[in-house]
A protein has these predicted regions:
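N-terminal subdomain of nucleotide-sugar transferases
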Residues: 1-44, 48, 186-196, 200-205
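Histidine-centered beta-alpha loop that forms part of the nucleotide-sugar donor binding/catalytic region
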Residues: 6, 123-126, 182-183
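A conserved catalytic-core segment of Leloir-type glycosyltransferases
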Residues: 33-91, 180-183, 189, 193
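Alpha-helix capping/helix-boundary segments
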Residues: 42, 103-104, 162-164
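Membrane-proximal helix-turn-helix segments that form the acceptor-binding/catalytic region
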Residues: 138-156
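Helix-loop-beta element that forms the nucleotide-linked donor phosphate-binding surface
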Residues: 164-184
C-alpha cells in the first residue's frame, strides 16, 4: 500500500508527521508492505530507514508558486508518477492508498480512476478549522478538494468522534462512511487494519 502525506520526518510541520511515521512503522510490524510518498524539497528520492519504512520524497518542479493550492496541485503530478512507478514495480500488486489530509487527494482520485486502486481519506484537520477566512477563494478551493476526497474515498478515517461530527456538520459526510480510530487506543493499529481489510473486499468504483 501507499501512504500519501505532505509532512513526514525529517520534514515536520506538526503532529501529522509523527502520526504517519508511527502508522507506517506499526504497519510494517504487521507485515504490511508500505510505501510513504511525501514532500521534501531538499531531500528527494527513495530511502529505506532502519525501521524498514520505504519513503519516496518528491519535490515541486514548478517554481515559483503563488499559493499553497498551485504548489500542491503541481506536486500531485510528481506524486502520481511515483505511485504509478511503485504500482508497476510491484506488478500491479498495489492494493490500497491512504491519503492524509487534502493535499494529495487529486493524485489519489486519478489513481483510483485509472488503476482501480481504492483509497482511504484520513483526516487530521479540515479547512473550516484551519482558515480564518474560509469563505475566500483559496479556502473555498481547498474545501472543494476535501469534498471531492470524501465523495471519492472508500472510507473516511478520523481520530475522534468530535471530528466525525464536524465532517457531518461542514461537509454533510455520510455517517456510515466515517470510521473513528483513536491513536490513543491500545488496539489502534488493529482498528486501522480492520478498516483497510474491509475495503480490500470491495472493488474500487
Amino acid at each position: 500500500m501507499i501512504i500519501f502525506t505532505w509532512e513526514f520526518p525529517p520534514r515536520i510541520a506538526g503532529q501529522l508527521a509523527y502520526y504517519v511515521n508511527r502508522l507506517a512503522a506499526e504497519l510494517i510490524k504487521k507485515n504490511v508492505d508500505v510505501y510513504v510518498v511525501t514532500y521534501n524539497n531538499s531531500w528527494t528520492g527513495f530511502h529505506q530507514g532502519a525501521d524498514g519504512i520505504k519513503a519516496f520524497r518528491i519535490s515541486d518542479k514548478v517554481q515559483p508558486q503563488i499559493n499553497v493550492l498551485t504548489w500542491m496541485l503541481s506536486l500531485n503530478q510528481e506524486a502520481e508518477r511515483v505511485a504509478a512507478d511503485i504500482y508497476y514495480s510491484m506488478k500491479h500488486e498495489l492494493d490500497l492508498i491512504d491519503v492524509h489530509d487534502w493535499h494529495f487527494i487529486p493524485a489519489a482520485v486519478t489513481l483510483k480512476r485509472a488503476l482501480k486502486i481504492p483509497f482511504v481519506f484520513s483526516i487530521d484537520s479540515i479547512e473550516p478549522h484551519r482558515s480564518r477566512n474560509n469563505s475566500g477563494p483559496l479556502s473555498s478551493s481547498i474545501k472543494s478538494i476535501e469534498s471531492l476526497g470524501m465523495a471519492e474515498t472508500a472510507r473516511i478515517l478520523v481520530k475522534s468522534e468530535w471530528m466525525k461530527q464536524e465532517l457531518k456538520r461542514y461537509y454533510n459526510a455520510s455517517d456510515n462512511m466515517i470510521e473513528v480510530v483513536s491513536p490513543a487506543a491500545e488496539s489502534w493499529i488493529d482498528g486501522i487494519l480492520a478498516t483497510y481489510q474491509k475495503l480490500l473486499e470491495v472493488p474500487a468504483n
